[in-house]
Amino acid sequence: MPKMKTHRASAKRFKRTANGGLKRHHAFTGHRFHGKTKKQRRHLRKAAMVSRSDIKRIKQMLAQMH
């Protein structure tokens, strides 16, 4: 059986945490900041955790990452 391959697009977007969770960046941070408040922009800068319902699927894509 061939080796499992890591989904490279996902590997660039997610980072594993020490406790087995996954960190991600927020969407809506590329442009058009004039329509967002300072508070919104500040919160969008911080990393977020992947929701529980998505973790299993993403971990399968990142199977070979340590």
Curated annotation (Swiss-Prot):
<dbReference type="InterPro" id="IPR021137">
    <property type="entry name" value="Ribosomal_bL35-like"/>
</dbReference>
<keyword id="KW-0689">Ribosomal protein</keyword>
<protein>
    <recommendedName>
        <fullName>Large ribosomal subunit protein bL35</fullName>
    </recommendedName>
</protein>
<keyword id="KW-0687">Ribonucleoprotein</keyword>
<dbReference type="Pfam" id="PF01632">
    <property type="entry name" value="Ribosomal_L35p"/>
</dbReference>
<feature type="region of interest" description="Disordered">
    <location>
        <begin position="1"/>
        <end position="23"/>
    </location>
</feature>
<comment type="similarity">
    <text>Belongs to the bacterial ribosomal protein bL35 family.</text>
</comment>
<dbReference type="InterPro" id="IPR037229">
    <property type="entry name" value="Ribosomal_bL35_sf"/>
</dbReference>
<dbReference type="GO" id="GO:0003735">
    <property type="term" value="F:structural constituent of ribosome"/>
</dbReference>
<dbReference type="GO" id="GO:0022625">
    <property type="term" value="C:cytosolic large ribosomal subunit"/>
</dbReference>
<dbReference type="InterPro" id="IPR001706">
    <property type="entry name" value="Ribosomal_bL35"/>
</dbReference>
<dbReference type="InterPro" id="IPR018265">
    <property type="entry name" value="Ribosomal_bL35_CS"/>
</dbReference>
<dbReference type="GO" id="GO:0006412">
    <property type="term" value="P:translation"/>
</dbReference>
